[in-house]
UniProtKB/Swiss-Prot annotation:
NCBIfam families: PRK09355.1 (NF006830), thiM (TIGR00694). ATP binds at residues 132, 178. Substrate binds at residues 57, 205. The lineage of its organism: Bacteria, Bacillati, Actinomycetota, Actinomycetes, Micrococcales. This is Hydroxyethylthiazole kinase. Pathway: Cofactor biosynthesis; thiamine diphosphate biosynthesis; 4-methyl-5-(2-phosphoethyl)-thiazole from 5-(2-hydroxyethyl)-4-methylthiazole: step 1/1. Belongs to the Thz kinase family. One of its GO terms (molecular function) is ATP binding. One of its GO terms (biological process) is thiamine diphosphate biosynthetic process. It comes from Clavibacter michiganensis subsp. michiganensis (strain NCPPB 382). Its EC number is 2.7.1.50.
């Protein structure tokens, strides 16, 4: 059993936004609707639960829209976009926009496959709060070009920064580019997050679950850049902690859930590395 978590009404003494938002998340336990891919549904739900949020995997048309209006945050992940889920994603995104629910678009493999590419362009036009993807996905979404090998990036993170800036300014969104060093921009400011571990790339859902964490944090702060940075810092610091005790991808996946449960605002403040 993990130690009791501090209340958000207690001062952390850290003065860091990421630490303070972690406290707030654990007090509010935001309800995060996840329209995500079939491969990562269980892992994503467990990540949110371990962190202190409440997952809801509501992805059925006629239910997805109404739920997005009452959820704290919404994730739309295009990893396995079957027909019913595509309908639910568009319905939920429209509802979130109308209700002011912050939402995250993860355009998995955009540019590599036609169905998800059309859907990604339709959804980004609805101005998601955050777009999260690898460098190749961000470039493809911004330029209409090819997007690497499915979910794998073939471009460097720095090479995608111009595309991310264009996306952010065009659609009024924050763009988070995942990589060895995550780059996050609102089109004017750029923050680089220097925490994480390569084992995240060896676990199915390691990146997709971060989109759900971003949706949780986006519900807590009116500045989506600050929220995306906090989500990335907390998640990647937990990954570092998990990697320290892991013997490989299997133990890392379990350890990541334990680390997300155990990570404290004080640890976040100590280990966060931003530039």
């Amino acid at each position: 059993m993990s130690a009791a978590r501090p209340s958000a009404h207690e001062t952390t003494g850290t003065g860091t936004a990421s630490a303070d938002l972690l406290l707030l998340l654990r007090e509010r336990q935001p309800l995060v609707q996840c329209i995500t891919n079939a491969v990562v549904t269980g892992f994503t739900a467990n990540v949110l639960l371990a962190l202190g949020a409440a997952p809801a995997m509501t992805d059925v048309p006629t239910e997805a829209g109404p739920f997005a209006r009452i959820a704290s945050g919404l994730l739309v992940n295009l990893g396995t976009p079957h027909a019913e889920q595509r309908e639910a994603a568009v319905e939920a995104a429209h509802a979130a926009r109308e209700a002011g629910t912050p939402w995250v678009l993860d355009p998995v493999a955009v540019g590599a496959l036609p169905v998800r590419t059309r859907l990604a362009h339709e959804l980004v036009a609805l101005s998601p709060t955050v777009v999260r993807g690898n460098a190749s996905e961000v470039i493809a979404l911004a330029t209409g070009g090819a997007g690497g090998r499915g979910v794998d990036a073939t471009d460097e993170v720095e090479a995608a920064l111009d595309a991310a800036t264009l996306l952010a300014r065009t659609f009024g969104t924050v763009v988070a580019i995942s990589g060895p060093v995550d780059h996050i921009t609102d089109g004017h400011r750029v923050v680089r997050v220097h925490t994480g571990d390569a084992l995240l790339t060896k676990v199915t859902g390691g990146g997709c679950a971060l989109g759900a964490v971003m949706a949780a944090f986006a519900s807590l702060d009116p500045d989506p850049l600050r929220a995306a940075v906090a989500a990335t810092s907390v998640y990647t610091i937990a990954a570092e902690i998990a990697a320290e005790g892991a013997s490989g991808p299997g133990s890392f996946a379990v350890g990541l859930l334990d680390a997300l449960d155990a990570v404290t605002p004080e640890l976040v403040a100590q280990r966060e590395r931003l530039a």
